[in-house]
Curated annotation (Swiss-Prot):
Pfam families: PGI
Principal place of residence: cytoplasm
Organism in which the protein naturally occurs: Chromobacterium violaceum (strain ATCC 12472 / DSM 30191 / JCM 1249 / CCUG 213 / NBRC 12614 / NCIMB 9131 / NCTC 9757 / MK)
Its biological purpose: Catalyzes the reversible isomerization of glucose-6-phosphate to fructose-6-phosphate.
Identification of the protein by name: Glucose-6-phosphate isomerase 1
Keyword presence, Protein biosynthesis: no
Catalytic activity reported: alpha-D-glucose 6-phosphate = beta-D-fructose 6-phosphate
GO cellular component assignments: cytosol
Protein's GO biological process: gluconeogenesis; glucose 6-phosphate metabolic process; glycolytic process
InterPro entries assigned: G6P_Isomerase, G6P_Isomerase_C, Phosphoglucose_isomerase_CS, SIS_dom_sf, SIS_PGI_1, SIS_PGI_2
């Protein structure tokens, strides 16, 4: 038994589950005409319908009691106050300070961090204006037309997702490119599209030692210098987001063009910081500020709304209901908007790197499930790929259906078809189709007898598949900021319930350590390290293939 599983609310929910697991949402809707109105809420430009979940008032009552018994109120306050809730690294967790639009003091070790936050935002704004206005010129006195962001993980996924999502708001002269993969192909193909005279490289690495990022950055630098043939020109075409001024200067980047962030900003929560420089360059300072404003709206709601009307808390606790009671090991993100095509990958890192943990804060092994596998694709594409499994497969995979009510970028007639599919899928997942309904349908098609009965089981949909429908008034910087912050806080809440640290990522370290040794073997700097027979054979195959 762990701290969590000993809580009275945890045990009470198991008693409730014994009855609730037999309920069907179709019956719940039939018995309660007001269900949709009661199980929905709006925050800023976001509307959440969570009525199509396997929940009742008793379920929600039990889940909110579990949140309180797990200490969620105190943990929310601790995060916003700047307490060092990342215990394994002894750090505060203050991505919320980066969008603290009230500018009220937030202290770390007694120091108000807001002056530094505002100073970096001001520098970012001035630089973005210079690039966007054409005042910032390359080594041949031409304005910048292409921006190549070089980073990985949180230094790539966040800026890439936001720039893709808000493309209609981007500067018409600027083309955005993102390079993260160290395989060489991504950088090679990117460099084919850009010109050294008009390209700005943004190198994003907190330590400026990340192997993948530095490998790509050095290769980009070599490519640039092969054309510019002047080391001094690097300063006009490379800027850095880092904390390592010495390494940045050695690279050839003017320290005046290094934008700082801090150890209380986790990588996957960093797009609000200087890591968001590519976003500001592309969208402009005003739109970046709107992104922050949207996140701040959700922050204030999360801090102040009662749990029963708190959007992040509701999503988190309903998620706990499926993960820990129904055994639902995956969760689907299905945005019905092509501009949001990178959102599933972004949420995947945000959730799985945060809560994919096997021990509690006290270091004890968990005796319950933690983070689900997050996956997904744009909704329409998903319907023709994996929705078959979601409708008739054997897994319980809750689905977030995300769309915008207004879409200024859509072509005439397209948006209505899109939204019809969103609403239809939510209804289909909930209702399903009974055997009698299938028989009636087949009878209308002229089938009967054995021929009909042979088809019936294949065309039955069990329904009772949970969905959340998240609708934005429109996809714009403010609403996207709120949406991202919603998921950040949902993930935080689940981490609190499970008594785990959502803000470290030790699981990524072992592979990095082993890769250094194996790299030395592949490049001939080390003859043979100790490995298992499989790894040794793989190394031998590489050596044989490469002479």
């Amino acid at each position: 038994m762990s701290e969590l599983t000993e809580l009275p609310a945890w045990q009470a929910l198991w008693d409730h589950f014994a009855e609730a697991k037999h309920l069907h949402m179709r019956d719940l809707f039939a018995a309660d005409p007001g269900r949709a109105e009661r199980y929905s809420l709006e925050v800023g430009g976001l509307f959440l319908d969570y009525s199509k979940n396997r929940i009742t008032d008793a379920t929600l009552l039990g889940l909110m009691e579990l949140a309180r018994e797990a200490g969620l109120p105190a943990r929310i306050k601790a995060m916003f106050k700047g307490e060092k809730i990342n215990r394994t690294e002894n750090r505060a967790v203050l991505h919320v300070a980066l969008r603290n639009r009230t500018n009220s003091p937030i202290r770390v070790d007694g120091e108000d961090v807001m002056p530094k936050v505002n100073s970096v935002l001001e520098r970012m704004g001035k630089f973005a204006h210079a690039v966007r206005s054409g005042d910032w010129l390359g080594f041949t006195n031409q304005p910048i037309t292409d921006i190549v962001n070089i980073g990985i993980g949180g230094s790539d996924l966040g800026p890439l997702m936001v720039c893709s999502a808000l493309k209609p708001f981007g500067h018409p002269r600027l083309n955005m490119h993102f390079v993260s993969n160290v395989d060489g192909a991504q950088l090679k193909e990117t460099l084919k599209k850009v010109h050294p005279e008009t390209t700005l490289f943004v190198v994003e690495s907190k330590t400026f030692t990340t192997q993948e990022t530095l490998t790509n950055a050095l290769t980009a630098r070599e490519w640039f210098l092969s054309h510019a043939r002047d080391e001094g020109a690097v300063a006009k075409h490379f800027v850095a987001v880092s904390t390592n001024q010495k390494a940045v200067a050695e690279f050839g980047i003017d320290p005046a063009n290094m934008f700082e962030f801090w150890n209380w900003v986790g990588g996957r929560y960093s797009l609000w910081s200087a890591i968001g420089l590519p976003i500001m360059l592309y969208l402009g300072e005003e739109n970046f500020t709107e992104l922050l404003n949207g996140a701040h709206i959700m922050d204030q709601h999360f801090m102040n709304a009662p749990f029963e009307q708190n959007m992040p808390v509701l999503l988190a606790m309903i998620g706990v209901w499926y993960i820990n009671y129904y055994g639902g090991g995956s969760h689907v993100i299905a945005p019905y908007d092509q501009y949001l095509h990178r959102l599933p990958a972004f949420i995947q890192q945000l959730d799985m790197e945060s809560n994919g943990k096997q021990v509690t804060l006290s270091g004890q092994p968990v005796d319950f499930e933690t983070a689900p596998i997050i996956w997904g694709e744009t909704g329409i594409n998903g319907q023709h790929a994996f929705f078959q499994l979601l409708h008739q497969g054997t897994h319980i995979s809750p689905i977030d259906l995300i769309a915008s009510l207004g879409n200024r970028a859509s072509l005439p007639g397209h948006h209505e078809i899109l939204l019809a599919n969103v609403f239809a899928q939510a209804e289909a997942f909930m209702r399903g189709k009974t055997a009698d309904e299938v028989r009636a349908e087949l009878a209308e098609q002229g089938l009967s007898g054995e021929e009909m009965e042979a088809l019936v089981p294949h065309k039955v949909f069990g329904g009772n598949r949970p969905t959340n429908t998240l609708l934005m008034s429109r996809l714009d910087p403010r609403n996207l900021g709120s949406l991202i912050a919603l998921y950040e806080h949902k993930i935080f809440v689940q981490g609190v319930i499970w008594h785990i640290n959502s803000f470290d990522q030790w699981g990524v370290e072992l592979g990095k350590q082993l890769a250094k040794t194996i790299h030395a073997e592949l490049t001939g700097k080390l003859e043979q390290a100790e490995h298992d027979s499989s790894t040794r054979r793989l190394i031998q195959l590489y050596r044989k293939a490469n002479g």
